[in-house]
């Protein structure tokens, strides 16, 4: 029984916090196709059935009323079919099988005392057979919540649906004295179903803690910068698709999808913005591959802001500029002599420190996705030019960036990067104490540096760790990027590779 419960839990973890057909704004949607889930359900059912039927059940000793009993040599044969799952409400769902048949056989011995002083023991022994006479169904009601940093899972009830006369209880006594056969039969008949239901519920709740770590609230993106680590906020909900009439509907894991920074002090810094776009229902539900991963602008917006959080403020000193650079941080450098002549006149031949400051929260990164690619808008990035510890002028940079996304497969998931197609810069003067500033020089400088821009890579970990991804493709829709692929159990894949090598 315990093994049966543990295996059930493994599938329960993939079906959390359902709310049929209602999708929240998120950064990442991971959709599993109905056909894949049906195949998975069949394989899962066969695995459970084999495990149950081969599981050695320990002997049971106990006492009921005046009868002490011993149940030995327990054998079971269970057949499961029509695996299903369904959303029943916010954070609640049912999982089970619409077809359950079984046969259980045991040997038993029951002993009781008789006589005036109860000193004479009478023992009866024989065998018990419990079997289904009709098709039963098993339904497990779960409450699972992964919306917070600490997930919770619990089983509220287990129901074995039995039609009238659906189970036959047969106790056969092989002793010469068989006074308690009728009592034993009635006892089993009255307690079998309730004990199965309560036992499964208890075992599930006793073991759910082992599986909470399979759905972490933060997933490591294997990215580090400037002593900071990057994580994907994977809190969210699983939504049952709007399609009806199937036992295993397409399921969509809607994750927050924001990029969280863990700084060198161990503090976690979450995005200041929230998801604000929602793909169409068709985008996350209607696909032919096993899995679809849909990325929205929020993921990329929070990534850029996370990079700002990690890198800024940043100060560049004259000694950090390479000797071969076309511009040097000195007030008498030709570049500054042309763009800020008042600076050269007021502070001749003086070193310049450049301080780049993170944009204010009111100047959030804006990302848009359409058929041409990914458009990134970075607004009002302040850059201070400092001479003798005094800010002599400030420049505000606004960037419009066009990217073409590119897809690659990593060892632990999917990696998305991009190629820079276009970088437009709008430069304005924030403040100055050295007269006019010719901002066109800074625009030209940005154009020269365009080839040095590196686009960070986003890695989305494969949420199904026992499956590998194949046949990956990328497409762009209205405010989303979608990655399609198929899933294969790693053990099966290894067997196929071995067969190819043998041939």
Curated annotation (Swiss-Prot):
Signal peptide: which range, if any?
1-18
InterPro entries given for it?
Answer: Bactericidal_perm-incr_a/b_dom, BPI/LBP/Plunc, Lipid-bd_serum_glycop_C
Q: Which domain of life is it from?
A: Eukaryota
Tell me which GO cellular component terms the UniProt record holds: extracellular region
Q: Does the keyword Cytoplasm apply?
A: no
Can you tell me which residues are glycosylated?
330, 337, 370
What SMART domains does the annotation carry? Answer: BPI2
* The entry's keywords: Glycoprotein, Secreted, Signal
MF term (GO), any: lipid binding
One GO BP: defense response to Gram-negative bacterium
Which SUPFAM superfamilies does this one have? Answer: Bactericidal permeability-increasing protein, BPI (SSF55394)
Compartments, record wording: Secreted
Entries under Pfam families matching the protein: LBP_BPI_CETP_C (PF02886)
Family (UniProt): Belongs to the UPF0522 family.
Output the PANTHER family linked to this UniProt entry: BACTERICIDAL PERMEABILITY-INCREASING BPI PROTEIN-RELATED (PTHR10504), BPI2 DOMAIN-CONTAINING PROTEIN (PTHR10504:SF131)
What protein am I looking at? UPF0522 protein C
Question: Origin organism of this chain?
Answer: Dictyostelium discoideum
């Amino acid at each position: 029984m315990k093994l049966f419960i543990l295996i059930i839990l493994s599938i329960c973890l993939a079906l959390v916090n359902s709310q049929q057909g209602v999708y929240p704004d998120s950064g990442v949607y991971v959709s599993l196709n109905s056909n894949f889930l049906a195949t998975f359900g069949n394989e899962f059912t066969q695995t459970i059935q084999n495990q149950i039927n081969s599981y050695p059940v320990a002997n049971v000793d106990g006492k009921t009323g005046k009868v002490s009993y011993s149940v030995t040599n327990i054998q079971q044969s269970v057949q499961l079919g029509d695996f299903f799952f369904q959303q029943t409400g916010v954070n609640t769902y049912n999982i089970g099988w619409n077809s359950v048949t079984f046969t259980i056989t045991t040997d038993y011995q029951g002993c009781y005392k008789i006589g005036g002083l109860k000193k004479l023991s009478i023992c009866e022994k024989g065998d018990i057979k419990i079997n289904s006479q009709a098709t039963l169904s098993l339904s497990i009601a779960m409450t699972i919540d992964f919306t917070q940093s600490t997930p919770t899972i619990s089983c509220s009830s287990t129901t074995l649906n039995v039609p009238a006369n659906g189970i036959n209880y047969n106790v056969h006594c092989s002793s010469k004295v068989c006074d308690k056969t009728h009592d034993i039969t009635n006892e089993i008949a009255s307690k079998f179903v309730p004990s199965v239901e309560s036992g499964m519920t208890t075992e599930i709740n006793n073991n759910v803690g082992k599986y909470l770590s399979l759905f972490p609230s933060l997933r490591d993106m294997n990215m580090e910068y400037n002593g900071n680590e990057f994580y994907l906020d994977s809190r969210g909900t699983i939504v049952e698709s709007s399609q009806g009439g199937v036992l295993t509907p397409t399921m969509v894991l809607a994750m927050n999808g924001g990029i969280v920074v863990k700084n060198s002090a161990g503090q976690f810094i979450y995005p200041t913005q929230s998801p604000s776009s929602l793909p169409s229902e068709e985008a996350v539900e209607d696909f032919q591959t096993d899995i679809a991963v849909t990325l929205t602008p929020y993921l990329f917006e929070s990534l850029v802001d996370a990079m700002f959080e990690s890198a800024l403020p940043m100060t560049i000193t004259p000694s950090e500029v390479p000797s071969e650079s076309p511009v040097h941080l000195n007030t008498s450098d030709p570049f500054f002599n042309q763009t800020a002549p008042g600076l050269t006149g007021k502070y001749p031949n003086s070193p310049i420190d450049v301080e780049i400051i993170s944009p204010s929260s009111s100047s959030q990164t804006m990302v848009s996705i359409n058929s041409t690619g990914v458009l990134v808008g970075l607004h009002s990035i302040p850059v201070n030019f400092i001479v003798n510890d005094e800010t002599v002028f400030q420049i505000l940079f606004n960037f419009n960036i066009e990217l073409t996304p590119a897809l690659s497969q990593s060892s632990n998931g999917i990696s998305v990067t991009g190629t820079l197609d276009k970088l437009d810069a709008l430069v304005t003067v924030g403040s100055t104490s050295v007269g006019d500033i010719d901002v066109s020089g800074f625009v030209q400088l940005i154009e020269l540096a365009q080839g040095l821009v590196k686009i960070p890579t986003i890695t989305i970990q494969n949420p199904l760790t026992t499956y590998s991804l194949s046949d990956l493709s990328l497409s762009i829709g209205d405010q989303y990027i979608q990655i399609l692929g198929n899933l294969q159990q790693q053990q099966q894949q290894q067997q196929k590779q071995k067969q190819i090598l043998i041939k």
